[in-house]
Amino acid sequence: MTDAPLSEAMKPIIFSASEGPLSRAQAEEAFNLMFEGLASPAQMGGLIMAIRARGESVAEYAAAAQVMRDRCVKVSAPDGAMDIVGTGGDGMGTLNISTATAFVVAGAGVPVAKHGNRNLSSKSGAADVLTQMGINVMVGAAVVEQSLKEAGIGFMMAPMHHPAVKHVMPIRQELGCKTIFNILGPLTNPAGAKRQLTGAFAIDLIYPMAETLKELGSEAAWLVHGSDGTDEISISGKTDVVELKDGALRSRVVHPEDAGLPVHPFRDILGGTPDENAQAFRDLLDGAQGAYRDAVLLNAAAALIVAGRVTELRDGVEIARESIDSGAAKRAVEAVARVTSTSTA
């Protein structure tokens, strides 16, 4: 077979991975082979599990993310575009907080290039609820770009933009455990967004993910993990944050009261089916009060800090509140639905 010599190239890399962290160059070579379909299933599984067993390094995260970025179907986004996304996988089953936050932030005038997928840890992922909202998520780069232009926000469905991952998907499904691929979504925005509000399913991921985004050229980011276990800023308690700003990382803790918001019981943000979550989203856009609104206001305030619009959470909450109450966030949803409804690709 013509790919046998290239598969041979994986053997020393797998051995190195079992002994210690790979160099960035080694990891990039390995992930290129995997995404080209030139490594055998056993080799791909062996490498993934060797890395997982000892813990992934920042160089390995950065290498995998860079290879995915290089191979993705790219989207041209406005300057200052940001992504608001979580890793998923927290298993908490909440309402769609980051999705609603993205539209509130877009309604406030910050371009949002949102990268997402279907459900991972809940009954309703971003793509599931957006579909229920009348948005066609299975669109190509040109439609996403038009959506960004007309609505100030575009949704990039991960499988539409990362076709090379098809070679790895069967391996991931057979392994059935969390691997490096569970955190790559937020690191591989097809629009090359350089500002991120990113949630992680585990607290020990937020610092290395922040380091990775710095390595990949991000300008500003908040990496967050809520004390309630969510991959978002918690409305029910404190949230650990690693902030990337001016090329430096610093850790901080935020609390709803820092933003002038009340603490709500975690049960009040639990979600349901895509249809139920979409209805909660519609109600929020129409002015419904309560835990969901406050969670979105809090996350939007943080996103506005990352975007450089404000420096304090309380100021961000006021801008986010105006985005909802003025109807701007709702108009952003309607505009994306309009743009995407005329396309099937």
Swiss-Prot record:
Per the UniProt entry, the Enzyme Commission number(s) are: 2.4.2.18
Catalyzed reactions: N-(5-phospho-beta-D-ribosyl)anthranilate + diphosphate = 5-phospho-alpha-D-ribose 1-diphosphate + anthranilate
One of the entry's Gene Ontology molecular-function terms is: anthranilate phosphoribosyltransferase activity
Which positions does UniProt annotate for Mg(2+) 2 binding? D231, E232
What is the recorded name of this protein? Anthranilate phosphoribosyltransferase
Cofactor mode of binding and number, as noted:
Binds 2 magnesium ions per monomer.
Residues that bind anthranilate 2 = R172
Instruction: Quote the record's binding site residues for 5-phospho-alpha-D-ribose 1-diphosphate.
Output: 86, 89-90, 94, 96-99, 114-122, 126
- Tell me which family the UniProt entry assigns to this protein: Belongs to the anthranilate phosphoribosyltransferase family.
- Do you know which InterPro entries this protein is assigned to? Anthranilate_Pribosyl_Tfrase (IPR005940), Glycosyl_Trfase_fam3 (IPR000312), Glycosyl_Trfase_fam3_N_dom (IPR017459), Glycosyl_Trfase_fam3_N_dom_sf (IPR036320), Nuc_phospho_transferase (IPR035902)
What is the required cofactor set for this protein?
Answer: Mg(2+)
Q: Per the UniProt entry, what is one GO biological process?
A: L-tryptophan biosynthetic process
Name the residues that bind Mg(2+) 1.
S98, E232
**From what superkingdom does this record's organism come?**
Bacteria
Give the enzyme class. Answer: transferase
What pathway or pathways are given for this protein in its record? Amino-acid biosynthesis; L-tryptophan biosynthesis; L-tryptophan from chorismate: step 2/5
Q: Which Pfam families match?
A: Glycos_trans_3N, Glycos_transf_3
Q: Which Gene3D superfamilies match?
A: Nucleoside phosphorylase/phosphoribosyltransferase catalytic domain, Transferase, Pyrimidine Nucleoside Phosphorylase, Chain C
Q: Which organism is it from?
A: Jannaschia sp. (strain CCS1)
Q: Where does anthranilate 1 bind?
A: G86, N117
Q: What does this protein do?
A: Catalyzes the transfer of the phosphoribosyl group of 5-phosphorylribose-1-pyrophosphate (PRPP) to anthranilate to yield N-(5'-phosphoribosyl)-anthranilate (PRA).
Does the keyword Glycosyltransferase belong to this entry? yes
Which keywords does this chain's UniProt record carry? Amino-acid biosynthesis, Aromatic amino acid biosynthesis, Glycosyltransferase, Magnesium, Metal-binding, Transferase, Tryptophan biosynthesis
Q: How does it assemble?
A: Homodimer.
Record gene name = trpD
